[in-house]
Amino acid sequence: MTREKYESLPLATLKELAKARKMRGVSGLKKSELIDAMLALDEKEEQKEAATEAKEEVREEMKEKKAETDIEHLDSGYTANGILEVMQDGFGFIRSDNYLPGENDVYVSPAQIRRFGLKTGDILTGNTRVKTQGEKFSALLYVSTINGLRPAEAMKRKNFEDLTPIFPNKRIRLENSGSSTAMRIMDLVSPIGKGQRGMIVSPPKAGKTTLLKEVALSVQKSEPHMHLLILLIDERPEEVTDIKEAISGPNVEVIHSTFDELPEHHKRVSEMVIARAKRLVEHGQDVMILLDSITRLSRAYNLIVPPSGRTLSGGLDPAALYSPKRFFGAARNMREGGSLTILATALVDTGSKMDDVVYEEFKGTGNMELILDRKLQERRVFPAIDIPKSGTRREDLLLNKEEQEAIYIMRRAMNGMKAEEAVDNLLNMFSRTKSNAELVHQVIRQKFI
């Protein structure tokens, strides 16, 4: 307090204050003497506080310096970069190769996971701690980036489940300069939008893998910023190599689990891929998963789920379909920004009743279907697309008015034809025109195909 404030108080109040501050011999003092004594005590206390603050500042500086020297001392100099897998016990590991456990995995502590709100599927970068003799894995010292963003920015994201799904309304163009007839047909007959849940239904040897590869290359050209995840389950090793070499880029990841791997391996890989896609969508990015095939993934789950006591025809346990349906059902367009597009292949006419049951279970869940026809394939007509049966739900949100009119004319004309005749006629039209725009104008002008 200042002298003026003390002087404004009555003597009795001043004496009470002095007693509260444990000052001795104040009862016989005059008011002016008491005020002088109070001011002297104030000055002493201020000096003590200043000295204490200075000591605390020195201590904090020493702590910071010690922490910096500790980090420098503990820092191994190696930067960890990979996908995080959070285990049931709360800790996690940064996986590097093909999203699976390996010797070079990096341990992430539960405290770091809680502090930054980390989830399975996050891509982390950060320096590792010096490995001691008894440690099997290196440990993450500090987090530099989460999914390419600073930790403070990455923590602001919403949960995938809290985002609002809407119908796909932004088209992914598959037709590019020099694109194949298959891509032109697909772009017109069954267009794909951002957030589409599409299925390519195919008998064996009908060209489904080639079609997926063409889709991936077209998406790379038309949507260079879209993150492309190609998941190959139960495929041949040579096909994995072929796709890896054909499709590469900064936003492309080819994840595989070949037919010689265990079903648990298939399950783990697929769960890591869908977690990775969800984390990207939470940050408002557009992601596309090309899955080959959902039938083989369902077969793998059928072997590892605990028996439910019920069996569908073909020996399929209904409980085995929950996880593949959760995978396929994650595809959606988000109102808040970002989208997850899934294009999966389903096998039919393989001679296995189980494969047909899996297809029947997934039949109504997608919002786009492309049917490949065995008869066309036997006649060596490629692409072997059954055009009358293929299509997209709510295609009016993706096609313009002219394209809608042309498709209406084409479908009405094909109604009475056999599938082979319809495809032959259409293939002739596609070969005579250089682009889909030209084909649309020609169909509208002629009013028939």
Which positions does each model-derived feature cover?
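P-loop NTPase nucleotide-binding module
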Residues: G178-E235, I274
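Active-site phosphate-binding and catalytic loops of NTP-dependent enzymes
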Residues: G28, E46-K48, D70-L74, R115, ...
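P-loop NTPase catalytic core
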Residues: G207, V215-V219, L228-P250, V254-I449
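Phosphate-interacting basic helix/loop segments used at nucleotide- and nucleic-acid interfaces
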Residues: E72-A80, T181-I185, V273-K278, F327
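Short flexible coil/turn linkers enriched for glycine and charged/polar residues
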Residues: S76-Y78, V86-G90, L100-G102, L118-D122, ...
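Charged, low-complexity terminal tails
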Residues: M1-T79, I83-F91, Y99-N104
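N-terminal "pre-motor" subdomain/linker immediately upstream of P-loop NTPase catalytic cores
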Residues: M62-A154
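P-loop NTP-binding catalytic core
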Residues: V130-I200, A206
